[in-house]
């Protein structure tokens, strides 16, 4: 593949790529997003994410050759950029000098990328996040979900964009492989889950709710809902879920951080065989 040299910050190719860092609307309209860093870009390539363009500096080409090779094999266009251009494409203080413009993966009805292996397990489990707006929390949750084998997530309401730079970095590439579906309202999501024979549980900081440790995740299909960092779940979600569950707490803390609560929920699913890492 021919590699083009870019020496000017005024390059339209660079400007168009940089716009993908700025707004979710830009990414959505283009159907593209930016991945930054040698490891993340290589992960995108290994996950069969379509790579529209790769940008790299000469220093990065030498330092990260093993990571760049699979990326360049898949990239439709490749550009060697001057060092002073790299900050335009970066969301970090010290960019490595490796960037990819990726196409948002095509997804099946269950949210899994078409390039991913189908989910053939007898029980299906979903983590639902409602109005989770902190990119760091979102990235951590996605990373934890993949690590524990829970492959399906639903994002409801005003959740942040999973293709935002901080989410991508925090997820360690999990976005490329997880099943992710978005819903405008809790009602929309609940209707779909109900049609798929999935029981919805609202996670709340209320000792009167059912302890999550007693839920038989090893049988049936379950969805656990996690709410906004500051306000928790909406009344609509709580009222229409089949039951309320809580994470037993000691001490004086009133609630968990959203990503911490999600991690505990995901572990409970896996501990009871729901996640699937110990069951294929």
Language-model features and meaning:
Residues 1-67, 159-160:
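Boundary-proximal intrinsically disordered activation/regulatory segments immediately upstream
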Residues 4-8, 77-82, 179-188:
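Short acidic-hydrophobic, aromatic-tinged amphipathic segments that line or gate anion-handling sites
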Residues 37, 133-141, 256-261:
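Amphipathic alpha-helical repeat scaffolds
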Residues 46, 111-208:
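RNA substrate-binding interface of SAM-dependent RNA methyltransferases
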Residues 63-74, 237:
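Short, aromatic/basic amphipathic alpha-helical patches
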Residues 71-98:
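Glycine/small-residue-rich loop that forms an oxyanion/phosphate-binding "nest" at active or ligand-binding sites
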Residues 144-148, 162, 167-175, 235-280:
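Structured adenosyl-cofactor binding patch, chiefly the S-adenosyl-L-methionine
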Residues 201-253:
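Active-site/ligand-binding-proximal alpha/beta "capping" segment
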